A protein has these predicted regions:
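Hydrophobic alpha-helical transmembrane segments of polytopic
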Residues: 18-21, 41-48, 103-106, 110, ...
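Membrane-water interface of alpha-helical transmembrane segments
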Residues: 5, 9-19, 35-39, 70, ...
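C-terminal membrane-associated helical module and adjoining short loops/tails
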Residues: 1-3, 128-199
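Short glycine/serine/threonine-biased micro-segments
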Residues: 46, 54, 67, 109, ...
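Helix-coil boundary and interhelical linker segments in multi-pass alpha-helical membrane proteins
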Residues: 28-43, 79-104, 145-161, 198-199
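C-terminal ends of transmembrane helices
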Residues: 5, 56-65, 112-126, 171-181
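Multi-pass membrane catalytic core of lipid/isoprenoid biosynthesis enzymes
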Residues: 10-20, 27, 61-118, 140
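Topogenic membrane-insertion module of multi-pass membrane proteins
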Residues: 1-53, 172-198
Length: 199
């Protein structure tokens, strides 16, 4: 009976365990930013992204969605999609310290508001289609990766275009515009493509 209870406890927390695996992997990614190993930094943060999508999938399939799980997921999203890009920006896309402080503050505030709002409201469902109210926070990470690739390929006016892009994303995250949910498969392909381009 004791074994069965432990197995049941494990089953009920499997999604949370997967979510918590994001923490050590994200710490490794931060370490590689400091060590100037950009490819490895993005490799580990993409592993975090895969874990983030996996925990949600398992929670829904096993019907073990809980308030605790949602809270853990919220904090993990904050680390992966907001704190990692901000730390990366300060190290690799910092063209002007004042501007960097400004855009990172704006995107962090907007991202936290977006996460809190989604935690409270969830999806907007229209004609059985799922929509997000406001742009999703992974676009902060995506934009940071894209502009880093442009930067290392000597794309001009990055110092102007990148801050403008971050400000635009910040506005879109807290807007009431509706964005259709992108499939995980599409995100996976995009993540692999970006990783290849960074390599």
């Amino acid at each position: 009976m004791e074994i069965m209870e432990k197995l049941k406890l494990l089953k009920n927390n499997i999604a949370n365990i997967i979510s918590l695996l994001i923490i050590p992997n994200s710490l490794v990614s931060f370490y590689f930013i400091i060590q100037e190993e950009v490819f490895l930094a993005f490799l580990f943060i993409i592993i975090c992204f895969f874990l983030d999508t996996l925990d949600g999938y398992i929670a829904r399939k096993m019907k073990i969605v809980s308030n605790m799980g949602q809270a853990i997921d919220l904090f993990c999203d904050l680390i992966v999609y907001l704190m990692f890009p901000i730390f990366f920006i300060f190290n690799y896309l910092n063209f002007n310290l004042f501007v960097t402080f400004f855009i990172c503050s704006i995107v962090l505030i907007s991202g936290i508001i977006k996460l809190a709002r989604f935690s409270k409201e969830g999806f907007v469902v229209i004609n059985n289609e799922k929509y997000y109210r406001g742009l999703v926070v992974p676009f902060v990470l995506l934009t940071t990766a894209v502009f880093y690739i442009l930067h290392i390929n000597n794309f001009i006016y990055i110092n102007i275009l990148f801050p403008l892009a971050i400000i635009l994303i910040s506005i879109l995250m807290v807007s009431n515009l509706k964005f259709k949910k992108i499939s995980n498969f599409a995100w996976y392909i995009l993540a692999i493509l970006l990783l290849w381009m960074i390599y």
